[in-house]
């Protein structure tokens, strides 16, 4: 299992919640109306609840000017300004069947699965109809070894990275409305930035304001231009870098540090932040917030 599924500690979030420079955006456009109310649980200081719809999911999540939770094609991620890439919180897993047995077989096919770390699925209460929740736990001799280790120190992750230990929580959910796949949910050790009881499988259209899209197109950076035109579109967007300088750094490497508006090919992970009303961005129809630079002119970003 990939290392981006690490336990999430949200202590000190408010320290990092400073407004990004140059963001003239108003409040993000609302998602489609639903009959559900925002969670009763109070958001963290500096955050507010909003509805997220995309990637076959809809749920309530907290967002601030610096940190937010977004849907994507694989599930959901947390993004933070000045981080090079998103941190995964939820992941769809194709099972090729139904029920917990199919889920175990699907996990055994995942990269990094170690058959020596024997595991079993334990059903728990999902707290809502049409949803089954399962927790992956160590089994057999592996369980005995883990139990001995857990008596001495915290072990947050077991079972090849998919199971629980004695610190934090993670589980799988099966939806009646989404047969043939399961959703892995990473809770961590503290109350998450999303409301786990609101997670629903859906066929609704992705909300471009709350869904991280991967777009290919043409990027230009100059003295008065930061633009991106997606393939197959005639719309030129202003781009705002949220990757801690990765976008401009990679552009500079290709142009020798000359920001002269040269067109380069790029693949970016972005959300649509709507129209801004100040600066050069105001001349564009909308603004794309860049949360990851996948590649520029065929050169892929180094994993960090």
State each model region's role.
Residues 1-4:
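Positively charged n-region of N-terminal signal peptides that target proteins for export
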Residues 18-85, 163-169, 175-210:
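N-terminal targeting sequences that direct proteins away from the cytosol to non-cytosolic compartments
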Residues 211-226, 268-270:
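Structural detector for short beta-strands of small beta-barrel domains
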Residues 226-245:
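OB-fold (S1/OB) nucleic-acid-binding surfaces
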Residues 255-278:
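Flexible glycine-rich surface loops and low-complexity tracts that mediate binding to linear polymers
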Residues 275-304:
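OB-fold/S1-family single-stranded nucleic acid-binding modules
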């Amino acid at each position: 299992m990939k290392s981006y599924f690490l336990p999430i500690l949200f202590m000190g979030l408010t320290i990092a919640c400073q407004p990004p420079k140059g963001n003239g955006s108003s409040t993000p456009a609302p998602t489609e109306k639903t009959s559900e109310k925002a969670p009763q649980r109070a958001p963290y200081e500096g955050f507010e609840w909003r509805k997220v719809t995309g990637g076959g999911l809809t749920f309530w999540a907290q967002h601030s000017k610096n940190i937010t939770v977004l849907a994507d094609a694989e599930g959901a991620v947390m993004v933070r300004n000045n981080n090079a890439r998103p941190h995964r919180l939820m992941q769809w897993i194709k099972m090729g069947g139904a029920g917990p047995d199919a889920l175990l077989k699907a996990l055994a096919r995942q990269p990094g699965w170690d058959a020596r770390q024997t595991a079993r699925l334990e059903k728990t209460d999902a707290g809502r109809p049409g949803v089954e929740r399962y927790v992956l736990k160590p089994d057999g001799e592996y369980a005995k070894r883990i139990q001995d280790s857990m008596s001495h120190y915290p072990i947050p992750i077991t079972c090849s990275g998919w199971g629980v230990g004695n610190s934090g929580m993670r589980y799988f959910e099966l939806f009646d409305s989404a047969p043939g796949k399961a959703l892995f949910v990473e809770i961590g050790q503290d109350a998450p930035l999303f409301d786990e009881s609101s997670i629903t499988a859906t066929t609704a259209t992705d909300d471009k304001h709350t869904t991280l899209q991967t777009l290919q197109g043409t990027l230009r950076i100059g003295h008065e231009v930061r633009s991106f035109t997606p393939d197959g579109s005639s719309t030129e967007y202003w781009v705002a870098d949220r990757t801690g300088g990765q976008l401009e750094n990679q552009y500079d490497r290709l142009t020798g540090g000359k920001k002269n508006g040269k067109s380069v090919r790029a693949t970016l992970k972005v959300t649509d932040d709507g129209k801004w009303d100040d600066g050069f961005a105001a001349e564009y129809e909308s603004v794309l917030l860049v949360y990851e630079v996948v590649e520029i002119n065929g050169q892929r970003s180094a994993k960090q």
